[in-house]
């Protein structure tokens, strides 16, 4: 028996398009119009509350929490060091974004605080950052102080939180 050889140029027959099939045979969940008529959130309205809009400044990440203890602060700084971020300390007398000199969004639009010394390149211990923070607080006790974690590879600020609020700022 001789082997059969198929030619690559031979065409295969394809059936012509016959149109879409009817969807009447597919299962469909039908709801009665009566089942949606009694839907109400009326029972939940009494327990809803509105967030207070005045006298409730929120500054940065973790600002909704009570002030951080020394241990909590060291844990946060340790977290940013473990991620390879560079700690920076900043301070400001106001503590939140505002526009004083300009209404156009540019470099000096109120988002930048004064940096305390230089970023702490090469820092690998949270207590070093804490000592610098205490020195900054001693020099500027009436200012807000925050810790920033800067990623020098991505060139972005990855974390920022208030580490100290001056007395009477709440």
Curated annotation (Swiss-Prot):
One of its GO terms (biological process) is reductive pentose-phosphate cycle. The keyword Transcription regulation does not apply. Disulfide bonds: none annotated. One of its GO terms (molecular function) is ribulose-bisphosphate carboxylase activity. Its main location: plastid. Keywords: Calvin cycle, Carbon dioxide fixation, Chloroplast, Photorespiration, Photosynthesis, Plastid, Transit peptide. Residues 1-46, 1-47 form a transit peptide. GO terms for cellular component: chloroplast. It comes from the Eukaryota. It is found in: Plastid, Chloroplast. SMART domains: RuBisCO_small. SUPFAM superfamilies: RuBisCO, small subunit. Belongs to the RuBisCO small chain family. HAMAP family: RuBisCO_S_bact (MF_00859). RuBisCO catalyzes two reactions: the carboxylation of D-ribulose 1,5-bisphosphate, the primary event in carbon dioxide fixation, as well as the oxidative fragmentation of the pentose substrate. Both reactions occur simultaneously and in competition at the same active site. Although the small subunit is not catalytic it is essential for maximal activity. Heterohexadecamer of 8 large and 8 small subunits. The basic functional RuBisCO is composed of a large chain homodimer in a 'head-to-tail' conformation. In form I RuBisCO this homodimer is arranged in a barrel-like tetramer with the small subunits forming a tetrameric 'cap' on each end of the 'barrel'. This is Ribulose bisphosphate carboxylase small subunit, chloroplastic.
């Amino acid at each position: 028996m001789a082997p059969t050889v198929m030619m690559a140029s031979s065409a295969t027959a394809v059936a012509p398009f016959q149109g879409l099939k009817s969807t009447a045979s597919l299962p469909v969940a039908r709801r009665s119009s009566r089942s949606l008529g009694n839907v109400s959130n009326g029972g939940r309205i009494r327990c809803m509350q509105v967030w207070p809009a005045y006298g409730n400044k929120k500054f940065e990440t973790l600002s909704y929490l009570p002030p951080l203890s020394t241990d909590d602060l060291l844990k946060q700084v340790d977290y940013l060091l473990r991620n390879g971020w560079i700690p920076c300390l900043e301070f400001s007398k106001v503590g939140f974004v505002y526009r004083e000199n300009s209404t156009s969004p540019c470099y000096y639009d109120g988002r930048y605080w004064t940096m305390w010394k230089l970023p702490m390149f090469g820092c690998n211990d949270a207590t070093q950052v804490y000592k610098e923070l205490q020195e900054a607080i001693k020099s500027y006790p009436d200012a807000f102080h925050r810790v920033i974690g800067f990623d020098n590879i991505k060139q972005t600020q990855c974390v920022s939180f208030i580490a100290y609020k001056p007395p009477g700022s709440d």
